[in-house]
Amino acid sequence: MSLNQLKAPRGANRAKKRVGRGQGSGLGKTAGRGGKGQKARSGNMHFEGFEGGQMPLQRRLPKFGFHNIFRRELEEVKVGDLQGLSGVVDPAALKSAGLVRGNRDGVVVLAGGELSSALTVKVHRVTAGARATIEKAGGKVELIPAPQTMHQKAKAAKKAAAQAK
């Protein structure tokens, strides 16, 4: 077999849709655009949410809320998910166990499920119910400081540069 003998499999290349070429094609006269109206014209500009000139819903409703750029997004782990682990449980151990991805601003342990083994849990945040469950099983909870956000790192670098002068 050589390059000049290569051929696309049957049905791989669809024929170009030829519109407006007679009734027999099924796409004659209006070319599949239906009757008259804005959508039948060329360059039919209308944006998503356009209501024919009526004030659209997204503009009729008032704005509310905001997105806090300093918000910390924590990865959640339930106490019951820690059941298979042993010894010291920290974010690195949780990542290797596949319980967290490790791409957020820290880890929070939530109540939910049972725990039978004593664990030392080192996380960024823990709920009261989760702490009670861990300590009831004979374990202990240690809070570790949250990793710095990009904003905090930039601020610290700026402060260090100012003090170095």
UniProtKB/Swiss-Prot annotation:
Species the sequence originates in: Anaeromyxobacter sp. (strain K)
Region annotation (Disordered) ranges: 1-44
Gene Ontology annotations for the cellular component aspect, listed alphabetically: cytosolic large ribosomal subunit
Cited Gene3D superfamilies: 3.100.10.10
PANTHER family reported in the protein's UniProt record: 50S RIBOSOMAL PROTEIN L15, LARGE RIBOSOMAL SUBUNIT PROTEIN UL15M
InterPro entries linked to this entry: Ribosomal_uL15 (IPR030878), Ribosomal_uL15/eL18 (IPR021131), Ribosomal_uL15/eL18_sf (IPR036227), Ribosomal_uL15_bac-type (IPR005749)
GO molecular function: rRNA binding; structural constituent of ribosome
SUPFAM superfamilies reported in the protein's UniProt record: Ribosomal proteins L15p and L18e (SSF52080)
Amino acid composition bias (Gly residues), ranges on this chain: 21-37
One Pfam family this sequence matches: Ribosomal_L27A
Name by which UniProt lists this protein: Large ribosomal subunit protein uL15
GO BP annotations listed: translation
Purpose: Binds to the 23S rRNA.
Keywords from the UniProt entry: Ribonucleoprotein, Ribosomal protein, RNA-binding, rRNA-binding
Self-association and partners: Part of the 50S ribosomal subunit.
Family classification: Belongs to the universal ribosomal protein uL15 family.
